[in-house]
Amino acid sequence: MYQPVIISSGLVGWQFMQRTYDQQLSTFNDSAEIKRDTDYFVQNIGSIETAKDLVSDRRLLTVALGAFGLQDDIDNRYFIEKMLSDGTTATDALANRFSDSRYTDFSAAFGLGPSEARGALSTGFAEEIVTAFQANSFEIATGNQDDDMRIALYAERTLPAVVGGTGSETTKWFSIMGQAPLRSLFETAFGLPEAFGQAD
């Protein structure tokens, strides 16, 4: 698989990444493993009707979770199935209990809860999920060489949506603190102790 090129850390490395990002991402997306998984997702996601269907297909679930940065939950099948089958419309739904908005976004996108419209039936849904999966996978590959660069790429991609969201300032702050890469960025930028994210 293609490994991102990082010439150095710090500002020089970031500027190089900014200049070469589109080309590097395109090359990364053409890697056999990424292409195989994303092609499979596009061809098969339309047949998913229930949460159980999705968690039963590891290849589909890999792309689905990876699109939301939740790839570490791949082996928590019962947890993911429960989250998807609960949906997000009920206030006591599992996804709504987390400060990390990625879980709510994930469940809402697939729409497999009670009385929810299945996301897979929406025009452009598969392509949108694939694009997010590719970006997140590239960030992970970048982080294998330079974790600070990964955090910067993740923040550049996700922070505008958090800041531009409709929630209160408190909600936005909790959303930032609930996402490990963003929390790490803010802890470093403001010199906050690691325990700050766990403070009530």
Task: Tell me the role of every PLM-derived stretch.
Residues S122-G167, P193:
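Extracellular/secretory-pathway and virion-surface proteins
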Residues N29-A32, R36, R59, R97-S101, ...:
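Alpha-helix boundary/N-cap detector
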Residues M1-A32:
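Short, compositionally biased, intrinsically disordered N-terminal export/targeting signals
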Residues G69-D75, K82-N136:
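Hydrophobic, ordered structural segments
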Residues F16, D37-Y40, T50, F79, ...:
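Exposed alpha-helical structural elements
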Residues G46-D53, A90-A95, T158-G164, E169-I176:
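Short, recurring structural edge motifs at helix starts
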Residues S56-T62, G66-D86, F174, G178-D200:
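Extended intrinsically disordered, low-complexity coil regions enriched in Ser, Thr, Gly, Ala
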